[in-house]
Amino acid sequence: MKGAKSKAETRSTKLSVTKKPAKGAKGAAKDPNKPKRPSSAFFVFMEDFRVTYKEEHPKNKSVAAVGKAGGEKWKSLSDSEKAPYVAKADKRKVEYEKNMKAYNKKLEEGPKEDEESDKSVSEVNDEDDAEDGSEEEEDDD
């Protein structure tokens, strides 16, 4: 049985496998000022459904149960019953697109106010300390 590996040898080769980081891990940091994407019609429906479900089932605290019940209810609704939620979602989408245009326009103009933001906090503090003098360094006891 030449070439056969023991269990210990196969385990060690499995452990040596290197995993690649997730695709989005290296992406740029998210801008907190960027408008959030609008809710879909289903999520607009779920906002209302959660309230009514909690009133009918006050003891049920399971998020999964609420989601499952909401999904089943959404599937059972006709297109005419879904229409108000679709209209709300479309309204939010239009508002989002308007906000995104304003956001992108602001990005294209560039950072006018944050000219000094390229410096780190320590650099800014060092500059302030240099202007005040070096009173702290005179302790030669």
Curated annotation (Swiss-Prot):
Residues 35-104 bind DNA. GO terms for biological process: chromatin organization. One of its GO terms (cellular component) is cytosol. InterPro entries: HMG_box_dom, HMG_box_dom_sf, HMGB_plant. Pfam families: HMG_box. PANTHER family: HIGH MOBILITY GROUP B PROTEIN 2-RELATED, HIGH MOBILITY GROUP B PROTEIN 4-RELATED. This is High mobility group B protein 3. Residues 124-141 have a biased composition (Acidic residues). It is found in: Nucleus; Cytoplasm, Cytosol. Expressed in lateral roots, root tips, stems, cotyledons, leaves and flowers (excluding ovary and pedicels). The modification Phosphoserine is found at residue 122. GO terms for molecular function: chromatin binding; DNA binding; DNA-binding transcription factor activity; structural constituent of chromatin. Residues 1-12, 70-110 have a biased composition (Basic and acidic residues). Belongs to the HMGB family.
